Amino acid sequence: MDKLCYLPKHPDIKLYQSDELFKINTDTEVLGEFLNIYKEDIVLDMGTNTGALMLYANMFHPKKIIGLEINSKALVLAKKNMELNNITNYELINDDIITYTNELVDVIICNPPYFKTKEDNKSNDSYKNLAKHESELKLDLLVKSISRNLKDNGTLFFLYLTSRLDEVVLEFKKNNLVIKEMKFVYDTNKEYSNVCLFRAVKNGIQGLVVDKPVIIKRDK
């Protein structure tokens, strides 16, 4: 059954979520708040799920927002969420991120699965599991697709595990994505950063800024 919720800190922006699909979490929130989009931009949300990051992108009133998602059930809910918020400048595409090729875009948003798949999890292909583990969406193939679909000087907003930072840097460099901004995300229940936010520019000029970290406060 679909449940009506709202974006964290934005009670005026409502969305439906389902127990059968991956729900928004703090990763969604910190990436959504990290975005910076211009009105003339065409935005692609890779792996849009039920459209939460499309709703964050819509706050900037871009020219067009495209949601790419392999799960057709998630897209049904994404469409419902766009209509719920009276968004008309959108397109939803049911396709595989790895093979997807279409119009080049100004901005790509991506909150991908980032846990490496253990051998005992390979047989578990539920949508929730695929949304967390990279069994069907390896980092190298994902970054190739991002670069292929992004205009020169286009911007990527990306979230990934801090423990795999070296892999992200390597794959970005292979695919001409220059990291311009990084922001580490900390949880008050942990002594280390779990995830990191990236803003990268395709064929951009070198020059990296490491921002002040995001601190997620949790009850102990």
Residue ranges and their predicted role:
Residues 33-121:
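Conserved SAM/SAH cofactor-binding pocket of Class I
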